[in-house]
Amino acid sequence: MIKHRIMSAATLLGGVVFTGHAVAQSPEVARRLDAKYDVVWPAADGLIRVNKGGYRIPDSRMKSNGKYGYADTLGQLVVPPAYDDAADFGNGHAVVGRKAGDGRMLYGLIDRSGRVVVPLEWERLGGVRNGVCVARTGTAAEREFLLADTLGNVRSLGYDYCSDFSNGLARVGVGAYVEKENVAGITLRDAYEFRGKFGYIAPDGGIVIPVQFDDARDFAQDGLAQVGIQGKYYVKWGFIDKSGRQVVPCNFYSAEEFLGDRAVVSKVVAGGKLAYGYIDRSGKEVIPCQFDMASGFRFANTWVGMEQDGEYTYTLIGPNGETVLPFRVGDLQDGGKYGHAAASISDAAGRKLFGIVANNGKVILPFEYDHIAIFSEWDAANNRWQESAMGTKDGQNFSFDISRRGE
């Protein structure tokens, strides 16, 4: 069987992504675990998630025929592979799942010794935050949300909806579940969606921001959350702080969380078209809504795009809208861990040529390849991300180490 190393300390469990702080393990430990298990994750909170009998699939979830357990950073097995689903450890605990006789996956919580502290009887269970986690029972229109602590105490919250805790607060809702329209006829992970009003609670279950918003997002690390108020035609978005104070009015068709001092927002412009731009933390539109695509400032500069006849071209700009790259590119792949982006330009004959641009606008691989793709992989031995590029040119394959190159 092919062995796999997971390239991210994240997994999708019960419909929610859980992440843990990655901790380096020695190359020797990594080799021993790779030889013994079929899938090995980076260490998180001092323990390494392993899988026996499964294999990695493109969306990073596992086939259900594998079993999950945990080893320590010395390679010693701590929790034998006995679970049908599992998340990384975080805050001393991990969510694990086991299939019931009726085929449902039921989740519970274990501590670092493998002791079950919350029984495996919930259709969904979030990770531990502030000493508590959110449990859910019921999967259709009737659902109950509960608050569980690490001592195993569980109590009903009394809301129709509750998210996991994020930066000290959780979203709660009062309303109802309606069946999603399934035009494509595909199997949906959750066939129902919640519609109602939203507010926020503290880890003790007490209300902090009253239920009042027509839509809401989790609080980010900067202490702000996007909230939406129904307008005449659509929900309009803005930002509040943890006291509930409106710091950016609900004036936008969409609003992403702040990265640095800029947030991507959009407005409806002439002809019903969406235009994207950027605001600062006061809500001022510092880069006007004029683009057909805009990405957040994960690094010093970012990419914006314009569409014409179904084709997008992209420009690299700075935080005040200044042009960083003096030409436009196509076929943008900007998911690199260090800000690198693969893209294309066209020669005089219209042939696409691919290269790689650093976030500072420097071309670090010339535009002369038939295709280029960027890959990121966690390097446990050096406790860092390793970034590579694979390119083709005239039928030949090339590989490049581009980790932090050009920055």
Regions found by a protein language model. Give the residues of each.
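Bacterial N-terminal signal peptides that target proteins for export
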Residues: 1-10
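Bacterial N-terminal signal peptides
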Residues: 10-17
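Sec/Tat signal peptide C-region and signal peptidase I cleavage site
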Residues: 20-23
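Residue-level detector of conserved, function-critical positions
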Residues: 25-407
